[in-house]
Amino acid sequence: MSLSLPEDIEPFLDDTHTWTDSAVYALCLSRPHNLAEVWDTKFDHRPDYWDELVEAANVVYVGAAKNLISRLEDHHSQDVRKTVLTAVCDIESLRNVWWCSDMDHAIQEESKLSIMMQNQYADTYVHSR
């Protein structure tokens, strides 16, 4: 499975939100079977979270967006604003969307939601900026 836009956003929409609203989002990622090789080809060193990334059963990337669909399209196309993890991992699906009133609110919520997910899903590596 991979990210399919805008269809993957539709289950999270309601009467008060549109695809272009600000939000915090969580993407399920899949690591390549040769993660170390792929990583070493793209980057000069491995991050301090390397062991967590490798040992976790699942990987989730949490991000904030001023315009949700635009940011997800950036992730999907990888033409602009690449992230480290999506440069080496494939996006499997959009796991969740938390709508926010604006980008400032989304940035504040991103950290809180990341920590909540880390605490709630011990077998998952949760990455945010």
Regions found by a protein language model. Name each.
Residues 1-66, 70-73, 104-112:
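GIY-YIG nuclease catalytic motif and its immediate N-terminal context
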Residues 117-129:
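Coupling/hinge elements of helicase-like and P-loop NTPase modules
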Residues 59-62, 92-102:
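A short, exposed loop/beta-hairpin motif centered on an aromatic-Gly-Thr core
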Residues 74-78:
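Residue-level signal for well-ordered alpha-helical positions
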Residues 86-92:
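Charge-biased low-complexity segments
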Residues 16, 85-86:
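Short secondary-structure boundary/capping segments
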